[in-house]
Amino acid sequence: MKYSAPIRLNTLGAIASQHGVLVVIGMLLVVPMAFPLLPIIATYCAAIFVILLPLGRLQHVLATASSVAFAWLLTLRNPSKGLVEAGLGDDALHYMNAFYEFQQAYCCGPLDVLKTGIRSAGGGEPIFWFLSYSVAKLFDTPLLVWAVLIFISLMLAWIAIYRCSERFAYVVFVSYLSTITLYALQGSAIRQAVAAGLVMIALDLLIRRKLVSAAGVGLIAAGTHSSAAVVLLACAVVVLFLSRDYGMLARRSSGLGRVGRLIVLLALAAAGAVFGSAEFVMSKIQARLSESQTGSAWELQLAVEAVLACLFAWLLRIKLPREEKMAFLLFVVVCFSTSLFAPAVGARLFRYTYCFYIVYLCAFFFARQGESLGQKKTLASLLLLASFGWAIFIVSARYQGLFVSGGVIDHFLAGPFF
């Protein structure tokens, strides 16, 4: 005998009434634990829609929402439970102290801002500390200042990515959100996080042959974190001494090319005047040499990633200008050379290799005009799948503190439901 529709509905209602309490309890247990993961899940789901549909400028909304969500999630790590467990370093507390001093000071001159930054975090890069001071005057807690700086760094990266690859820009942006660089930089290396976003924009301008603009953005990046000056110098050496195109431009245009070269040289001279003082350089070198860092895990990772990047570029015939390839190879050589006498410096420079990878990946999608849209969608799907797997590995291996030990999940378990 078949059940009629009313009987079936009554049966479902009875089941719901008998187990309603269990259902509610289950929701109260699941929602607080699942909600912190929803922004991450939504980010990857949105990337799938970008692959399937041409969303165009709607990607700006998605990138902004993802940046806000990740900035919020990354600031929920609780340093009091242990810096290692929270996926942070000692500098995170130093930055918090500096932000707190900025918020407590009623008036603070430029020199006082720099002195506070040097005393708290050991770095006197003016652009970062002036930016932090401005943000600190707008918000009440150091945690909000930290979140805003994370948001700024992510949006800078998004600007560079979208300029290179409009169609699949959000997919590439999600790949950046899946790297170890994201979690490392947004914690105890927030200065370098902002500088990395500026470096990506400078690399994009270099690909477009806007050399003066690239030099200007590179100088701003160096004023945010001095390590970015190494990337700037590597690109400048390639452009000024190894570039055939720029040399031909200078010869063909009697006035314009020479003026452009002169502006670039003056910009480098200004960088040397600001960051090249003996006191500044020696303080940086002594600080880095005093750090005890053993092991060669990052060196092995750099070698493997560099070889895979070159192999990937050769197999897929990535069309990149000669200067970009030489700048990347020169920067890798500098990283390895620096690691011989100052491993801590090399480890910091290593983080910028992801700037090359991401911008070049965008240029790959942008430059391959002969490929069909289906092939590009396939490559974007593989990139998204690999990024998701890599993110799971990184979080489970090194950044569990983002979700446990006072992190996101514990934060919500202590919320309104419990």
Curated annotation (Swiss-Prot):
| Membrane-topology annotation of the record | Multi-pass membrane protein
What GO terms describe the biological role, i.e. biological process, of this protein?
polysaccharide transport
Kinase is among the record's keywords: no
Segments forming a coiled coil = none
Q: Which UniProt keywords are present, listed alphabetically?
A: Cell inner membrane, Cell membrane, Membrane, Plasmid, Polysaccharide transport, Sugar transport, Transmembrane, Transmembrane helix, Transport, Virulence
Q: Where in the cell is it found?
A: Cell inner membrane
Homology family? To S.marcescens SfuB.
Protein name from the UniProt record: EPS I polysaccharide export inner membrane protein EpsF
The organism is Ralstonia nicotianae (strain ATCC BAA-1114 / GMI1000)
Q: What is the lineage of its organism?
A: Bacteria, Pseudomonadati, Pseudomonadota, Betaproteobacteria, Burkholderiales
